[in-house]
Amino acid sequence: MSGSAAKVISIARGEVGTHEKREGGHWVNDSKYNRWFGRIPGYGQDGYGYPWCAVFVAWVADKAGVPSLYPKTAGCSTAVNWHKSKGRWSAYPAVGAQVFYGSGGGAHTEIVYAYDATYVYTIGGNTNTNGSAEGDGVYLRQRARRDAYLYGYGLPAFPEGVVTADPALKGKQGFTYKATASAPAGSEAPKPKYEPFPGADFFRKAPRNAIVTAMGKRLVAEGCSAYKDGPGPQWTEADRKSYAKWQRKLGYSGADADGWPGKSSWDKLHVPNV
């Protein structure tokens, strides 16, 4: 690992694909990051149902061992003021920076992992990539640098210094100017312990491979077997019926428990990486 920025980005990337709780057909903001941060009175889900994009950033910083370099808050506006009060604010991106969106930066926040002349590349919590108003998880995003919605950047005081596109910081101690910057070495996410969701279409094509076998064994272990001969590598109707049992065990019903795997239920099944 080459530095704190790389560690932050690696931790954040490892969370891509994590989702908040879903209830009654809607995402309800209750995430593992909220549970780490704590209750906020007045919100649903027993105080855990609040927007969590800023909390995600604080959680990542904590897990990366640099909690003092990012604000620990659930409020984006509070986080903006935190960076500004430390003189760590810029209109230009930086690797590992906390980017803010909306009026005064109060609408949303993410972590920058790379940038070029046109785009900033980020990892964000409580967002999505489908255009829905309901943010539901952690995603990789690409944002236009000159989009009016983008407000600015907080620059953490990394011990190794900050790589930034801000020309005003060129030559200043603690900063390295780069017009474009890739993600730092060592910032790759670790190989997942569990098999990533292969996509809904994967199963509808009746695949035959080790993923299907591993899934079937986990369904049996969860008491959700509809198999007569035991799970095997070929996707069959027995797999679909077994998976429907798993969906019902999770509380899904109707079309949400039709036996076709979805990402949320798949992630909870913890199929070993094959």
In which residue ranges do the predicted regions lie?
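Aromatic- and glycine-rich peptidoglycan recognition patches
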Residues: 3, 87-88, 109-188
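Extracellular LysM carbohydrate-binding repeats and other cell-envelope/extracellular binding modules
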Residues: 245, 249-274
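...with weaker cross-activation on analogous glycine-rich loops/strands in unrelated enzymes
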Residues: 66-130, 263, 267, 273
